[in-house]
Amino acid sequence: AVMTPRVAGWEGVVFQPVRAPAEGVRTRRLSPLMLAETFLDRLERLGPRYNAVVTITRDRALAQARRAEAEIPTGRYRGPLHRIPYGAKDLLATSGGIPTTWGAAPFKDRVFDFDATAILRLEAAGAVLCAKLAMVELAGGMGYRQPNAAFTGPGVNPWNRDAWSGGSSSGSGSAVAAGLVPFAIGSETWGSILSPAGHCGIAGLRPTYGRVSRHGAMALCWTLDKLGPLALTADDCGLVLEAIAGRDPVDPTTADRPYRYPGGGPAGRRFRFGVLRDITDGCEPEVRDNFARSLDVLKGLGTVDEVTMADLPYDDITRTILFAEASSAFEDLIESGGIAGLTAPEDRYTAYARDAILAKDYLKSLRLRGVMAREADRVLARLDALVAPGRATVAAMLGTEVRSAIRGTARDMMGAVGNGAGLPGLAVPNGFGARGLPTSLQFMGRAWEENTILAVACAYQSATDWHRHHPEEF
């Protein structure tokens, strides 16, 4: 079922792309305080239905909104995110007594005395933090196999109460799709932004590794982790990325590459798309059908050519790096036996097996990652984007086992290459599949070329209306 956003009263700002309420705030037709109240109400009233929220930051949000009431009349307008409410995945540190739980029961009362850089940059852009959003415990780093792997319960998909919203940024996906916040910040090590975005019918952007500071974010895998936005449209993702991107002296992995988002790109531009041979193998029939229809749309926007990549163990390379670094990142928790307090039973023992990864295998994977990155760049050098189904299947049903490329029970060449080589990727909705659940289309580009795939995705969304479909409340 789909709904048309209501236009009467303050609820009329729900399911609107960021630029709409931003213009209302700028012209003083919308009160920042009432805007915050609208989404705080939805978070409090609807958040529990989706297991989407860990902590509602009402006091902080209202204080920020009140400051905006005083700033805007004086002409101090900070840009399109000025006083736009948002939520942050609960692996980003927040001060002021707001817990940062990492989705894990052993840390549910833990607080920090500082804010993550991404939180500070959004505050500087004028955005209003309304909630810390639920996530799979420890961002899935302990090897979970089913949706119920968080002390807040499984992420519920707003399109079907019996389906999962996807991991590990489950609350971010649910909250945006259900209209609880206009945008959210998630993280991806392998699939944790693109998966909930695709399963929930919204847009999700994985930036180039090093584009966004991870200072104050939980570390799962130092050489794979990335922070990025989930929002209603690709254009929204670009606006948010501009706010959070940039070098950070306290995160030495960030690159000294200033980033500006120019908008959707020049009208009438022709793009060059590539499709990897056999990329739809293993996809559900509806996913394949929707991808084929998406390719027809893309052929109206440019050229679509089949491409091939060298035969390398892409999944194994990225999987070995992830497993080895995760076992190191959580060494104290694992060796102390603290993982016994996690929610998913398999998370209490799977991590021990990863301690058996040999140093020579980790180092071999790091060396092969360089080969993988060069091969990906060879293919992408003559393209604007590689395109593929966002996910091979629609969202899993609650209570079932989740197929995962990370565990080797599913294939995800795009995810392995994109995350292993640190390349930007973007998922947008492209239809519906089994049980009325969304399917998605993903674009992957060269390192540092987020604006190219954003332009591609904006062009696709200008030619389709899947991003205007929203779930009914339940």
Model-predicted regions and their roles:
Residues 20-27, 38, 42, 70, ...:
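Serine-dependent amide/ester hydrolase catalytic core
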